């Protein structure tokens, strides 16, 4: 109405209609019509034809409604000229040094094989494994840990304890995060000396089946005092450090957060501050890559993240580092198209 009235009033009011012809909704329609296992070039051909049909249908409806526009010369994002112009524009951005390649964790749908925007994520209840894992303190840092807790020495092995509902992300662990301002206790127990947030310690010991009389607090300190103390990775031959991050909460868990920069935004942000690598062992199909280190109980390579969960639990149990394992029902992000659980994955 506005375009028509301004044109009739003598103004130059050109309207060039256009259509965004790309996106997962079109691919999803083709998948529903033709199945998931067709070749990529055929998918693109079918998507182009489907988009063209929709353009013509909508164009007829707009013309019938009396919309005044250049209907013989619309812009289409799938037009080869438009795509070529986009590449030229990106080339200019690249030449000016405004573009760089990096990794960042995003919502990832295993069925779409693609990243999802926040608006494409729905939350539904899901049952997940919830585990408490002990990270052994590196023997070369035992003295440093003792000093942090005001002790002259440790009487035995000590462990930083994390709680997670995504065991499959442990192969990508690069650190354990503590809150710099939280109070942490070193508690001697039959399972070793455990580092736990003071506010959560009682609930944790109860969860591990340790009687209150069996747990003796031998020292306390702020999380900041634990910064850069080295730990042994639970099942890989490498070390990870305790680092400080304000994303750590005392609402649940142990007050220490398993940190995998490839699989979480908070992990990525704190990891970037500490210069941690963003090592992503999971492919876009949700399966572990071929170079993923094997566990003593079996191979992770080629397994989906969901199939990896029980293997990781078996490995931790075999090494005596699984303090507690249970199932919980919680709200979890799902793909709005496939209604299937998604993951965070660096890409």
Where is each model-derived feature located?
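Catalytic alpha/beta core of large soluble enzyme barrels
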Residues: 1, 12, 172-283, 317
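N-terminal, positively charged nucleic-acid-binding surface of large information/translation enzymes
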Residues: 1-191, 260-265, 270-273, 277-292, ...
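Extended hydrophobic/Leu-rich segments
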Residues: 145-146, 197, 230, 310
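A short, sequence-level motif marking secondary-structure junctions
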Residues: 150-152, 165-168, 197-205, 246-248, ...
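A glycine-biased structural micro-motif
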Residues: 223-228, 295-309
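Mg2+-dependent endonuclease catalytic cores in nucleic-acid-processing enzymes, primarily RNase H-like
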Residues: 290, 299, 313-314
């Amino acid at each position: 109405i506005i375009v028509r009235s301004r044109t009739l009033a003598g103004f130059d009011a050109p309207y060039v209609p256009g259509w965004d012809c790309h996106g997962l909704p079109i691919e999803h329609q083709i998948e529903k019509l033709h199945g998931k296992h067709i070749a990529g070039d055929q998918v693109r051909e079918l998507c182009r034809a489907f988009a063209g049909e929709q353009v013509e249908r909508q164009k007829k409806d707009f013309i019938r409604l009396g919309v005044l526009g250049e209907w013989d010369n619309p812009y289409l994002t799938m037009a080869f000229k438009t795509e070529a112009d986009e590449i030229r524009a990106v080339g200019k951005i690249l030449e000016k040094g405004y573009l760089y390649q990096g990794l960042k964790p995003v919502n990832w749908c295993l069925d779409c094989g693609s990243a999802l925007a926040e608006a494409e994520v729905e939350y539904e209840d899901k049952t997940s494994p919830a585990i408490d894992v002990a990270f052994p303190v590196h023997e070369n840092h035992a003295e440093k840990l003792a000093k942090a807790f005001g002790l002259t020495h440790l009487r035995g092995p000590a462990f930083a304890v994390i709680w997670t509902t995504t065991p499959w992300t442990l192969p990508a662990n690069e650190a354990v995060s503590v809150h710099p301002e939280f109070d942490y206790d070193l508690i001697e127990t039959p399972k070793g000396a455990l580092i736990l947030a003071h506010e959560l310690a009682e609930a944790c010991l109860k969860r591990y089946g340790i009687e209150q009389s069996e747990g003796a607090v031998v020292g306390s300190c702020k999380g900041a005092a634990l910064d850069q103390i080295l730990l042994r990775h639970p099942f890989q031959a490498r070390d990870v450090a305790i680092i400080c991050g304000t994303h750590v909460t005392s609402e649940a868990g142990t007050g220490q957060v398993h940190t995998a920069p490839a699989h979480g935004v908070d992990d990525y942000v704190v990891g970037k501050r500490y210069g941690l690598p963003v090592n992503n062992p999971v492919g876009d199909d949700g399966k572990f890559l071929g170079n993923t280190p094997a566990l003593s109980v079996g191979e992770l390579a080629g397994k989906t993240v969901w199939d990896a969960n029980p293997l990781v639990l078996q490995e931790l149990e075999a090494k005596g580092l699984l303090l507690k394992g249970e199932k919980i029902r919680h709200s979890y992000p799902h793909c709005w198209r496939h209604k299937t659980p998604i993951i965070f994955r660096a890409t």
